[in-house]
Structures are given as structure tokens and as C-alpha cells.
Amino acid sequence: MDISYEAFFRSLTGVAQATKAASNEIDTIKQLLSPGNEGSETKTKSASLSFQDWQVIIQQNVTKMTETTIHIALVAVAMSFLRETARQNQPATADDISQCWTIIRDALTSTTSSQTHFTASRSAQGFLSVPLCSLVKDGSIDELIRLHVWMPDGKRGNPDFHLHSHQPFAQSWILAGQGVDHSYEVDPVEDPAEATHAGYALAWNDGKGANTAYKTHQASSTVQNTGKLFRAVKIHTEAHARGSTYTVPAAEFHVSEVAPDALHATIFFFDSHRGFVKDAGVLGPKDGDSFTQLRDPAGVTPAELAEAVYQARLREELD
């Protein structure tokens, strides 16, 4: 899978947004790795490099980069690989995913790159997430790649709001543990007796105010009962373990289930280029009003999440 310069620089912008990287750090990477300046033979703007060659070129420039910029650049390469592989419907091998995971883990656990601000937050679905690459367009997710980790801590979110959908198409690559995905057919109804749920509208708050514009770094999210009634029927259940991948179409309602005492980790890619539905929402109790999920991870750091996933993968390899 070749990665173009355009694809790499697009990912670099997304990683900068996800990590709140300083503009001078991103400028340094762009200058060093632009076509013709990357330490190898002159390239044209249309040139592409393999996943491996991108890593080699970054390593050739390590003396001109800080550890922070090295990690940012490598994560951008990994994000580019995942995006291009997914969009071209190409399978990513176990070795490919392991390489991407190693790059991510090294970045999250680096002790000297203090200026790279990876952050963890608690999802309404119970898992902890770390944004790795985020591109928002007109207030909606354009591309978003995150690390999702369900810790063996019993925290699985508010079960009243587990049935949800995503605005963008989504793809997940399983890193460790097992999860079960339940798909639902959801139809609007008028009769309250037929309804199983009510529809809820979602708003995000970044500490400056709440609205329907998506925010990469959130303080909380709130769902509000719309008064619209729906009937949800489970139509498919599928278990996913390490080495597998699955997709969730835009606006398809589903529930992700992970045992409360188990660890489960995925790389999750929200991709509006493969589908986007603006009014995708959440379902909840018919007689409910609203619910707010605080994003506070209660002190859990991205480094701790990465280490927990690393240890889980080691145990799986020994089993």
C-alpha cells in the first residue's frame, strides 16, 4: 500500500489537531519531509512511498527532529496507511496492524515528548478513547481515528443509551480482547405502545459551550429526548477478536458489548468519505429527558491505556 505525500500531509494535519501540537513542530515536519527535501532522491508532488519507506525516511531525519516531531510524523504515517488501506478496501495484515499499533504505543508512552498532548476521555459507551487523527469539516467529523479501550473496570456506560448510531461510516480493527457487536433495525412509530425507545439528539461541549458541532476535545456530551418514538429490533450479532476488522454503516444503530471484567481495544476510524448521515442519533428511554456524559477519564492517561493494551496483547500471544 503506497501512501502519497498528499495523504501523509492530510494525516499530519489531523494528528496535529488531535494532539494540539505546536504549529512550529508541524512546520518542521513538513519542511523536512516535503518532496525533494526528505533525504533521498528528488520526488514529485504526485509521488507515493510505501508504509515502510515513509518510516525509513523519517528515521533518516531523526537528527533534525525532536522526539515529539518524530512521534507525530510516524503516527501520521500509520494513520495514512489505515485510511488508504480502508478506502481502497484492501486487507490490513496482522503484521500491518502490529506495526501501526507499535507506532501508536511508542507515541503514547514516550516520556520525553511532553509537548505532544495526547488525551484520554470517557465515552458514553463506557470505553476510554484517545484521538489520534481528527479532521472536522463544517462542524462535522470528516475523518477521526481513535484508540478505544474498554478497561476491565466494570465501567460500561449508561445502559439506557447503549443503542446508538454514528454520523460517519466507521471501521474498527481489533487490537486485543473480544467484543460483541449487535446490529438493530430501527423504525419510527406513532403508537407509544409499539415504541421501544425515544430518539435523542446529541450535543458536544468543549468547555466553551454546547452545540451540535463536533469537537475533538470535549468536556462532556449531552443527549436530549426529541419526543420522536422508535421501535428497535435486534437483527444481527457478531463477535470480534484480535486480528479481525468490521464496519458500521453511517446511521446504523448498534450496541458494542464487552464483558465488565475484560479488556478490549480497537483502532476505530470514523470516515465520512465512505458515508455520512447528519441526523444520525442515539436511542434512549421513552420517558427520559436528558443525560450528560462527562468526558473526565478519572486520571487514566493515554500511556496507561497503551501499556494495558500492550500487556493484553502479550498475554494473548502466550495463550
Regions found by a protein language model. Give the residues of each.
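Intrinsically disordered, low-structural-confidence terminal and linker regions
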Residues: 1-31
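A short, N-terminal "cap"/entry segment at the start of jelly-roll beta-barrel domains
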Residues: 38, 43, 47, 51-146
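Conserved short histidine dyad/triad with adjacent acidic residue
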Residues: 113, 146-164
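Short, conserved beta-strand element in jelly-roll/cupin
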Residues: 165-181, 185, 269
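A short hydrophobic beta-strand segment most commonly corresponding to one strand
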Residues: 171, 261-278
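Short beta-strand His + acidic residue motifs that chelate non-heme Fe in jelly-roll/DSBH
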Residues: 181-182, 248, 254-260
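Short acidic-glycine-tyrosine-enriched beta hairpin
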Residues: 185-250
